[in-house]
Amino acid sequence: MTVLPRRDFLKTSVAAMASVYGLPASSASAANAAAQPASKHASKPALIHATDLFRPHADPDDHFDLATVFSLVFQDRIDLLAVMIDHPPAGHAGDPDVLAVAQMNRIAGSSVPVITGSPERLDPAEAAKPGNRAGASGAFALLETLRRSPRPAAISIVGSCRDVALAGRLDPDLFAAKCAGVYLNAGSGTPDKSLAARLEYNVGLDPVSYAAIFDLPCPLYWLPCFEVAPGGEVRFAVAAHGTYYRFLQQDVLPLLSTRLQNYFAFLFKQGESDRAAQSEADALRPNWLRYLDGPREEALLERQGRQFRNMWSTAGFLHAAGLGVSADGAVAPLASVASPAYTFDPVRVRCGADGVTEWSPDPRSRDRFIFRVRDVARYPAAMTAALTTLLRALP
């Protein structure tokens, strides 16, 4: 497989791809964008959710994210065009969790389709080869979804950047015209390049593709997972330029509807976190619908309630929907949040092919923004309250 030099990442000819696959080359350019959400394009913004959602789960936060997005669908806040699920990385036991998407469609009364991602990073020329078409189908499906959308759509990335990066390389003109913004939940928010050299998990999945996201011809809302990626003596920590927060699950799960509690119980039941309490038959049974509509497993939920849940991506979903969170955890339209828990600040940022970022504040930037916590002490409680509000909206 040929690895393109970073400088050539977005310079590959699009014309050849258009001729092979009938991809139209749009002549429209990206409009100047201030630090406003993708919802500026329509009263009901469109969203594509790209996630590493697996069963058995890698980390249950992805299932909380999925429920958050579908809560916005149920409340008619967004038009969710598709859920794109990463190809499982090498050594991972799970498969793309289409069962979880089916459950959320059932709960929200929606019919959102699923796209599965590419098993390896390809350059556009390789993606054009007939033998690789199936492997690159996720990127092509993403392009077709953008193309068919009646308005520009935002893309949230909470896992690997591979498929979005490839799609952007295949048709940058389409991204300029139809991508309202990318919400990139990955990386370290430190401006210190030496500290950023320890790669955060999502970056490590595909550093070259992560770097390419910073070059896309559309607005970028960068939500680093941590200010400094954990490792060695560095622990998980709430910080100004990191989205990380956590909560005790018993503070949230009992407040949810029975079906939503069953949705979470089903993923716990089939994941590592509750494996010791499950028979192999129970852990593998694909009875997603009957389980969803069945009685609660009180003992399972009580066990899981005693565990903490790490979270990262909530702020980006809300911002894409035109919503914000106040310092006390209230969810409201962005313009009405007087004391926000976080903001997106304009920056100048670059990222090398090794996945290491450098950035600095830039008040003149109109299309690159970084997440910033306004009050580190109050942020975890505010985000937990906001997440709870969203999840409680689901029936």
For each feature predicted by the language model, list its residue ranges.
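N-terminal export signals
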Residues: T2-V3, D8-A31
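Metal-dependent C-N hydrolase catalytic cores
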Residues: P88-R148, R366, V373-R378, A382, ...
